[in-house]
Amino acid sequence: MIQRILFIILLCLCSTSAFAQMEEALAPLDYALDSAETRQLRLEVDNMTFFKDNEFSGTVMKGCTLPGLWVTPKLTYQPLRNLKIEAGIHALIYSGAYRFPNYAYHDIAQWKGNQYQRGAHLLPWFRAQLTLRRVHLVLGDLHGAMKHRLAQPLYDPELMLTADPEFGFQLIADTRPAHIDAWVNWESFIFEGDTHQEAFVVGLSSRFRLNSEQSRWHVYLPVQGTIQHRGGEQDKGGSVQTLCNGAAGVGLRWNVGHKVVRYIGAEALALGCAQQKGKLWPFSGGSGLYAKVDVGFKYGLSARLGYFRANQFITLLGSPYFGAVSTKHDGACYPDHPQTAHLALDYSRTFGKHYALGAKVETFCNAPGRMRLADGTMQNTTTTFNTSFGIYLRINPSFLLKQF
């Protein structure tokens, strides 16, 4: 009863999803091509320097500290008004790390024997983008990570600091009634006789607008999903795995127009997951509920508190606090409707077109219920308060080298 009262109090006090302002500053939707850059050769440097500290307790997941940066210097050339080509190198660096595991990063990488790179985790970077009116086709490195605008139970923003850039194919359609982002992210390629599995993620993030975003009361319908497939024709050993996440709901945004409060928004999502093939998850399927309310203030301040409840729901790319399995204890899960109340306060500020600063404090009040261990035994758990703090500096300067 105490846990239920605590959740209700937290939800009523601050139910906000104000990460929107910080998203706009640190991960802007900058996929539109600029016709003024036609036939220009430019040097661009895309960088984020960060310090993030996760102080987590309990049985769900481990805490960690991420001090570092990633940087992508690249040459860009736009031969046509609607065609842009970019090529460069992506480097991920953590302070105090001098050797980096040499394989694909889907999260914080695990050490892998003598297969490593020195100084940084390096990857080639290439993107070709073609724009046809309101449709953008992308091959190579995608407009990914937080730019997909996936709900937090489906995508953990921390992956922007730990995972490799997404690579594959992407289609973005931005029309008056809808914004649609569909993509394939190829995570792992296998050669003949390889010992690991082929893996890729198919994703959809869409928002259907029932009226104009500038309306005083804006109503929209979000529909999102991710599917991960593991195994392929070259894979002779491991079993095929197909795992799915989905979300659909309704959102409301009140554009207040006050000198202090910019907007207040609310969103409710029904969540679902399914294990179509394989036995990687302890449950074959599940569902969940996620509700949030947004408040955006002047001067780049915003706040959020959301509420999550799971019924055997397992997240593919989201934080374990939005799911029913433990990443701290192998094979452990939570069959008794785990719940999480999430409060976030953030600040963001842009400096001109190419520079942005962000800071964020989060608290997760997690009540997972009983934990079922890998051997089938049940173990009681307690409600925990877990905090996270991060500060981020994003720079993306562009230098004209030659006009053809």
Segments predicted by a language model, with ranges:
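Surface-exposed strand-loop-strand hairpins of Gram-negative outer-membrane beta-barrel proteins
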Residues: 48-70, 100, 114
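Surface-exposed coil loops of outer-membrane beta-barrel proteins
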Residues: 136-207
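Transmembrane beta-strand segments of Gram-negative outer membrane beta-barrel proteins
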Residues: 29-54, 85
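Surface-exposed loop and membrane-interface regions of Gram-negative outer-membrane beta-barrel proteins
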Residues: 83-130, 152-153, 318
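Sec-dependent N-terminal signal peptides
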Residues: 2-14
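Cleaved targeting-peptide boundary
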Residues: 21-29
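Exposed, low-structure sequence patches enriched in small/polar residues
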Residues: 22-23, 46-50, 68, 125, ...
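Sec/Tat signal peptide C-region and signal peptidase I cleavage site
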Residues: 16-20
